[in-house]
Amino acid sequence: MEAAPGTPPPPPSESPPPPSPPPPSTPSPPPCSPDARPATPHLLHHRLPLPDDREDGELEEGELEDDGAEETQDTSGGPERSRKEKGEKHHSDSDEEKSHRRLKRKRKKEREKEKRRSKKRRKSKHKRHASSSDDFSDFSDDSDFSPSEKGHRKYREYSPPYAPSHQQYPPSHATPLPKKAYSKMDSKSYGMYEDYENEQYGEYEGDEEEDMGKEDYDDFTKELNQYRRAKEGSSRGRGSRGRGRGYRGRGSRGGSRGRGMGRGSRGRGRGSMGGDHPEDEEDFYEEEMDYGESEEPMGDDDYDEYSKELNQYRRSKDSRGRGLSRGRGRGSRGRGKGMGRGRGRGGSRGGMNKGGMNDDEDFYDEDMGDGGGGSYRSRDHDKPHQQSDKKGKVICKYFVEGRCTWGDHCNFSHDIELPKKRELCKFYITGFCARAENCPYMHGDFPCKLYHTTGNCINGDDCMFSHDPLTEETRELLDKMLADDAEAGAEDEKEVEELKKQGINPLPKPPPGVGLLPTPPRPPGPQAPTSPNGRPMQGGPPPPPPPPPPPPGPPQMPMPVHEPLSPQQLQQQDMYNKKIPSLFEIVVRPTGQLAEKLGVRFPGPGGPPGPMGPGPNMGPPGPMGGPMHPDMHPDMHPDMHPDMHADMHADMPMGPGMNPGPPMGPGGPPMMPYGPGDSPHSGMMPPIPPAQNFYENFYQQQEGMEMEPGLLGDAEDYGHYEELPGEPGEHLFPEHPLEPDSFSEGGPPGRPKPGAGVPDFLPSAQRALYLRIQQKQQEEEERARRLAESSKQDRENEEGDTGNWYSSDEDEGGSSVTSILKTLRQQTSSRPPASVGELSSSGLGDPRLQKGHPTGSRLADPRLSRDPRLTRHVEASGGSGPGDSGPSDPRLARALPTSKPEGSLHSSPVGPSSSKGSGPPPTEEEEGERALREKAVNIPLDPLPGHPLRDPRSQLQQFSHIKKDVTLSKPSFARTVLWNPEDLIPLPIPKQDAVPPVPAALQSMPTLDPRLHRAATAGPPNARQRPGASTDSSTQGANLPDFELLSRILKTVNATGSSAAPGSSDKPSDPRVRKAPTDPRLQKPTDSTASSRAAKPGPAEAPSPTASPSGDASPPATAPYDPRVLAAGGLGQGGGGGQSSVLSGISLYDPRTPNAGGKATEPAADTGAQPKGAEGNGKSSASKAKEPPFVRKSALEQPETGKAGADGGTPTDRYNSYNRPRPKAAAAPAATTATPPPEGAPPQPGVHNLPVPTLFGTVKQTPKTGSGSPFAGNSPAREGEQDAASLKDVFKGFDPTASPFCQ
């Protein structure tokens, strides 16, 4: 009757026009329905405008909906719709909006608003629906206007019963019956409508009751009833908008109001309802239109009906969980807006009475009962899938698509068996599929490859896969899997051939059925599958079959196995190609204890380090009785084995975890403990020699097959580590692995028992494991290196993420930072980082070093040997020197062959000490390393960066939470930890810290970054880790780190100039110099803290200057660096300062103080003496930061300059890790040095010394101020100045000596 004001009123005769807008439903409905006659014009008006408006303005006026709701108040249809829309909208919207809408409804009862609302409603529905599927489908209907739907709607809505009969029905429950009539018809599609109706009624009862007179209520009731019927009748035929519009056209008022308002209000209600809301809106509109006619002059009769309907609606809504419904009436009023929110009126009040959303049908039938809560959703779903099923229960289209989030609360029917996607659920393989029986992918019904190919499944009745006779479908799946496996096998064969060409004889691949795809033991799966499984695991799920085994490895086996552990799988795969990488991964994997502490169950990285893993893995399994890799857990392996083909994924998760062999090494012990059943550590280690045998035995036992080349291929595929351990394992394992000591000695230096290479933070057991693993890896490395040469590249590519940190170093200079950061995060999140750090330092580092040491292979090996015992022990206790040298060597080797000699030199000094334990293995490894060196230089680069990086990282990230209290461990991961603390506290520091994580810096500038980073990471972290103890270790490690750092710097310098020269040149070029502004931030905040810290930095600087000039020779240089490294400033400055200063002096001081070899001391004084003068000195100014602008630069410069340098040491390093890539390795040191010269002597002193402590404090301050976390240079400077006082205050409470690293 009242055409929406905004609605262009088409002539009443414009029935046809409405059809045009919503041709589907509109065309016939208007003429058809009695209501259509009067309503048609309005409906048409609304229809035409509504479709446009709705589509056009759906989103336009989110609040218009509210207005519309008000409108709806005027016209019951309108309020209804608005409420619905609101409800729907408010589904997403908040109660506030509901209130808004109510107010607006009350304020505005214009049809235009209704139209807008409906438009918005639709839009919101779209928004909502897209997200919530409910609304979305409605929208599509709206936009599409399916003729049938609309036609149906029209007819239904137009059905005479609507206005007259329903008026009465609604009051009494009879309405449900009429409604049911329609409902049954509509219910499918209109179930939601009914909900909406109910909501609307409920809302209307309250809102509209208030707003609308009884008359309105009667009309509204009629409209609602009709609407319901129409909805039900059209059963989705509503054609969304058209329907509401078209056959809703029947009420004149419905037309204008129902349409405009109905649309608006109803739309709103519908909006509240959900996807069906569009339909509901339309239906509502139409109903409203129907009511529209009577709406204006709603009689008491109508009112009663309406109120009854409202009550029912409310009940249904409430019962339905008006929450879902969102208060359909409410929507318009805003009351209905919330699903459950409604004033409680529509849904809450009434809905509660009714059953629940499940009652949608009934509610629909019942009048509006159903229309209430559930229905809105039902409709939402229905709309899309409203087409058919039954009155209120249309099959939920979203459920069919697997996207229905309503679950049991969905108003649409989920009673349909969805055909499973003919694909194995990769999560099921792992034993963890959250969707359980609801998973669209195949679980236990997937054919067991092992059983169907060999006729025998080791898992027997416990197999995760189906042993039922093959059907056409399952046979097709099996054939496809086997074909994939065969393809993978072909790839494996190629890989094996390539390896053989390289002089690497991979172990024979296990027979197809062997254990390539052991069924993963579900939860244990991740751990259970080990090398043996690791391979199978690596192999795709399908690899289990004979042909598949090879393919799985290359194609997916590694990946699937590693799905959880991509790095691992990469490594494993790479291991297959590059065992060293796998070994690295293995080493990287934290020890079982570590993993446990970290909660990282990442055998993955461990797994990837298959070589070792396989050894241990195989070894224990051998003892265990090959069939079950001990690592895999007997049950695990067997399970995995059989199903592995299908469970490849399970294996993959398990693979990583499963590759206990590898994990066993580093993290494997825990894994191993499973498999070997021996102590995780020692048990695992001893098995390592057996591992290869075990592999053979395992495969033989498993499949009763001998270790065939296929096995090796699989092993390679699955775990290159296996291959590594296999051959290298046989030779190396027996030699060193056989000896516990040799394991510790020869084993990965970092990981071996000696734990010398192992981070001190590691528990003794873990350390022993780490050492053993390292040794084993070393032993395996000869072979592994060969494999690694080829496989390392692959692994690096595959390893990307986890291996990325080191592979990036080699391959990607700049992007490596990103990858490193990414990998660091990954590692941090999943034990791999810790293990990587550890491994890199010890185990990983060893294989890599050996591999990467090629240039300084023996040095690297000795270092590695040293790393596990001497270097690691010394390094952990004294010396990142060995670790640094190791990392630096690999890095140097990797980053710069030129630098490698230096690295070797440094390494050899370190190597001798470190190589004590590894002496013998190094010899073997040297050969292997040499072989690998040429090809594996890349690997060394990866390992080396990983080495120190990993060590610190593992410690930092993995053990950061575990060993944060441990100074030593903190330092190692202090950098990583610093990252977090620094992120939390000083971002600038984190930048520097990032530098320490050489990965980023290294990758951007592998050589310099690795050196500085490693030196800082390995040495400084150690120094940091043990501020006190670090002095000793730093002394040892300091010299070594000096060499390493120097060598790294020199490498960079080789590019830039001499060590010292690079420092100076580095500074200017280094972004740090550019970033100097960061320091100002530090400087400013540091001003207050700088004063206090300045004193400390001063002393630290004094040593640092000394170290700086001496650079290589002066551990004292560490003092300034130590403050940096320690970030404690005072704490490590004294004792740790010496060590740190070596590293810092080397990386930071050389670059910084190369200008004044002896200026370091002078700058130290300057730093203490001239905070302002220290401007040049990033650090000095950082501490005193009197001149934030320049100092910041200096500080940043230094942080970047001295990646390992004071600033760069930890916080700045971290910062630099991001920025460092810009400076690049050489640039950073050069920048450091260069900046000081420009700045003058004072800057240098300040730079190296104060900035670290100061930076730590300052940066912390600044970051807190929010200066600019990583980049203190920019906003930090300003913020530093602005927040200098607050930062000072903040940091006054902070112990400058308490570095974030050591927190």
UniProtKB/Swiss-Prot annotation:
GO biological process, one term: negative regulation of lncRNA transcription
Compositional bias ranges of the Basic residues kind: 100-130, 238-251, 323-346
Region (Disordered): 1-388, 486-571, 605-685, 710-955, 996-1288
Polar residues compositional bias, start-end: 815-843, 1028-1038, 1053-1062, 1259-1268
Positions of C3H1-type zinc fingers: 390-417, 419-446, 447-470
Composition skew (Low complexity), residue ranges: 904-918, 1097-1110, 1224-1234
GO MF entries: promoter-specific chromatin binding; RNA binding; zinc ion binding
Residue positions, PTM Phosphoserine: S76, S92, S94, S807, S808, S904, S907, S908, S1104, S1108, S1110, S1114, S1269, S1275
Protein name: Zinc finger CCCH domain-containing protein 4
Name of the coding gene: ZC3H4
